[in-house]
Amino acid sequence: MAREKLKGKAYQKELLALQVELCKLQAWVKHEGLKVVILFEGRDGAGKGGTIKAITERVSPRVFRVVALPAPSDREKTQMFVQRYIAQLPAAGEIVIFDRSWYNRAGVEYVLGFCTPKQRDRFLEVVPGFEKALLESGILLLKYWLEVSNEEQGKRFQARIDDPLRQWKLSKTDLPSRTKWYEYSRARDAMFAATDTRQCPWYVVPSDDKKRARLNVLHHILKQIPYGRVPREKVKLPDRSKKNAYDDRASLKGRRFVPAKY
């Protein structure tokens, strides 16, 4: 039996508590010079964007950096497949979140015919070694697959069609992916079989309930990265210096102001 979906107030209370901890994690990552990669994969409409927004809502974009690469350029198509992702990897004190990642090759590219079966198979063969190299370079890698049901995906796609506030979310691959449900399922299973390793495991997140999925992901991230409290010096707000004071409000007279409509 499905659990009752979380109500707004209960969700916001839990979310805020987890976001406070994410701010502590952020300070620790910066203080210790850690390098973290968190990647999100899943079918279209699985809730990747909303989950990433919940993570980044109250943290610094200088520490948490979101990467959502467009389709490769003609030049990038001639490069090693993971090359454009390597350029986005974190330096010390950074957490990089991939909204889709190098696993595009195992999913959307393969299913929609943007790569050959041979290219997909070669990717699945070499990617565990690539991820092992990331670990050996000091990067902590977390891989999440958001699993949405056929019924829920249909509801979300229909909302993208009908709701003007969501129509921008409807991509060129959404509708074709809808007709290829089982092809995506087989591609997912092949990806797991080849790349769900002991060193770099996949974590599956049921995402029909968006709110619970977001909370579960945030909680899991905090459990996967040990962090402590960073000592902070007591800060005293300084007074405004009156040296060279002048009427700075009067100096704005005659400038263009945004109309105070509200």
Task: Identify what each model region corresponds to.
Residues 1-262:
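Glycine-rich phosphate-binding loop of ATP-dependent small-molecule kinases
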